UniProtKB/Swiss-Prot annotation:
The keyword Zinc applies. This is Protein GAT4. GO terms for cellular component: nucleus. A zinc finger (GATA-type) spans 53-79. Residues 29-48 are annotated as: Disordered. InterPro entries: GATA_TF, Znf_GATA, Znf_NHR/GATA. It comes from Saccharomyces cerevisiae (strain ATCC 204508 / S288c) (Baker's yeast). The gene is GAT4. Gene3D superfamilies: Erythroid Transcription Factor GATA-1, subunit A. Transmembrane segments: none annotated. Pfam families: GATA. GO terms for molecular function: sequence-specific DNA binding; zinc ion binding. Keywords: DNA-binding, Metal-binding, Zinc, Zinc-finger. It comes from the Eukaryota. CDD domains: ZnF_GATA. The lineage of its organism: Eukaryota, Fungi, Dikarya, Ascomycota, Saccharomycotina.
Length: 121
């Protein structure tokens, strides 16, 4: 079938009108309505998004990122769970202050008994 088919433009995208017979035939043309290009390169594999934790600075390609003191998903899973536990125990304002105090110090993620004064290292 070597008939010229009209091209329809819709919303800035060009589509080729294909007869129904062509879609019913078997082969590479039948699957997409257009002939396959044998010279096309295979698709590149997707790579994960690399993020840095706003608290501990850990670089991970994790699927789970949690809300932190700054709001958006800026904490790794471990720091996010720690922050949530601080909120439950001391409230959001105190938890936010504590997270700012221990940021980047290498302090273990252990819930303190109380949040008075400054953090001891």
């Amino acid at each position: 079938m070597s008939t010229k088919l009209p091209i329809v433009i819709s919303n800035g995208t060009a589509f080729k009108k294909v007869p129904v017979q062509l879609l019913l035939n078997s082969g590479s043309e039948a699957q997409h309505g257009l002939p396959r290009n044998a010279d096309s390169q295979p698709a590149r594999p997707r790579t994960g998004i690399t993020r840095t934790c706003g608290q501990c600075g850990e670089i991970k390609t994790s699927l789970q990122w949690r809300e932190g003191p700054n709001g958006a998903a800026c904490l790794c899973n471990a720091c996010g769970l720690f922050f949530r536990k601080l909120i439950l125990r001391f409230g959001r304002a105190a938890a936010k202050r504590y997270m700012e105090q221990i940021k980047g110090t290498g302090t273990k993620r252990r819930i303190p008994k109380e949040l008075t004064g400054t953090v001891r290292f």
